[in-house]
Design a protein with these regions (language model features):
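Compact, glycine-rich, soluble single-domain proteins
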Residues: 1-92
Length: 92
Protein backbone atom coordinates (compact mmCIF):
# COMPACT_ATOMS: atom_id res chain seq x y z
CA UNK A 1 0.00 0.00 0.00
CA UNK A 2 1.34 3.45 -0.95
CA UNK A 3 0.34 6.42 1.14
CA UNK A 4 0.66 9.95 -0.12
CA UNK A 5 0.83 12.96 2.15
CA UNK A 6 0.53 16.49 0.92
CA UNK A 7 3.07 18.79 2.49
CA UNK A 8 1.20 21.82 3.84
CA UNK A 9 3.96 23.65 5.69
CA UNK A 10 4.39 27.31 4.86
CA UNK A 11 7.05 27.91 2.19
CA UNK A 12 10.44 29.15 3.33
CA UNK A 13 10.82 32.92 3.10
CA UNK A 14 13.08 34.38 0.46
CA UNK A 15 14.41 37.91 0.23
CA UNK A 16 12.83 40.68 -1.76
CA UNK A 17 16.10 41.00 -3.72
CA UNK A 18 15.59 37.48 -5.14
CA UNK A 19 12.12 38.06 -6.60
CA UNK A 20 11.24 38.45 -10.25
CA UNK A 21 9.20 41.50 -11.23
CA UNK A 22 5.42 41.21 -11.15
CA UNK A 23 4.92 38.76 -8.29
CA UNK A 24 2.96 39.85 -5.20
CA UNK A 25 4.51 38.79 -1.88
CA UNK A 26 3.86 39.27 1.81
CA UNK A 27 6.59 40.54 4.13
CA UNK A 28 7.39 38.04 6.89
CA UNK A 29 10.30 39.86 8.55
CA UNK A 30 12.75 42.73 8.10
CA UNK A 31 16.28 42.38 9.49
CA UNK A 32 16.84 45.95 10.66
CA UNK A 33 17.31 47.55 14.09
CA UNK A 34 14.06 47.97 16.08
CA UNK A 35 14.55 51.76 16.09
CA UNK A 36 13.93 51.73 12.30
CA UNK A 37 10.56 49.93 12.61
CA UNK A 38 8.41 53.12 12.61
CA UNK A 39 10.21 54.46 9.53
CA UNK A 40 9.84 51.14 7.69
CA UNK A 41 6.16 50.85 8.68
CA UNK A 42 5.50 54.36 7.31
CA UNK A 43 6.93 53.14 4.00
CA UNK A 44 4.70 50.05 4.04
CA UNK A 45 7.64 47.74 4.78
CA UNK A 46 6.55 45.86 7.88
CA UNK A 47 5.51 42.24 8.48
CA UNK A 48 2.12 41.41 6.99
CA UNK A 49 2.30 44.07 4.28
CA UNK A 50 2.06 43.06 0.61
CA UNK A 51 4.19 44.39 -2.23
CA UNK A 52 5.45 43.61 -5.71
CA UNK A 53 8.68 44.37 -7.59
CA UNK A 54 7.87 46.57 -10.58
CA UNK A 55 11.36 46.67 -12.09
CA UNK A 56 15.06 46.47 -11.31
CA UNK A 57 17.65 49.10 -12.12
CA UNK A 58 20.67 47.96 -14.11
CA UNK A 59 24.01 46.99 -12.53
CA UNK A 60 22.71 46.25 -9.04
CA UNK A 61 20.75 49.47 -8.73
CA UNK A 62 17.61 49.89 -6.65
CA UNK A 63 14.40 47.87 -6.91
CA UNK A 64 11.26 49.80 -7.81
CA UNK A 65 8.41 48.31 -5.75
CA UNK A 66 4.72 48.96 -5.20
CA UNK A 67 3.23 48.45 -1.75
CA UNK A 68 -0.47 48.06 -1.05
CA UNK A 69 -0.54 50.94 1.39
CA UNK A 70 2.27 53.40 0.71
CA UNK A 71 2.54 53.54 -3.08
CA UNK A 72 5.75 53.14 -5.07
CA UNK A 73 9.28 53.15 -3.65
CA UNK A 74 12.85 52.64 -4.81
CA UNK A 75 14.73 50.34 -2.41
CA UNK A 76 18.45 49.83 -2.33
CA UNK A 77 19.59 46.22 -2.73
CA UNK A 78 21.02 46.04 0.79
CA UNK A 79 17.59 46.75 2.29
CA UNK A 80 15.88 44.43 -0.23
CA UNK A 81 18.18 41.59 0.91
CA UNK A 82 16.99 42.13 4.50
CA UNK A 83 13.27 41.92 3.69
CA UNK A 84 12.09 38.31 3.92
CA UNK A 85 8.91 37.50 2.00
CA UNK A 86 6.57 34.64 1.11
CA UNK A 87 4.27 34.15 -1.86
CA UNK A 88 1.45 36.68 -1.64
CA UNK A 89 -0.99 34.84 -3.90
CA UNK A 90 -2.32 32.98 -0.85
CA UNK A 91 -2.74 36.19 1.11
CA UNK A 92 -6.24 37.64 1.55
Amino acid sequence: MILSFKHTAEPAPQTLAELPAGRWVEIRSVDRPPAEAPWLAALGLSPGQRLTVLRRAAWGGPLHVRTEGAGELALDLDLARRIHVIDGSRCP
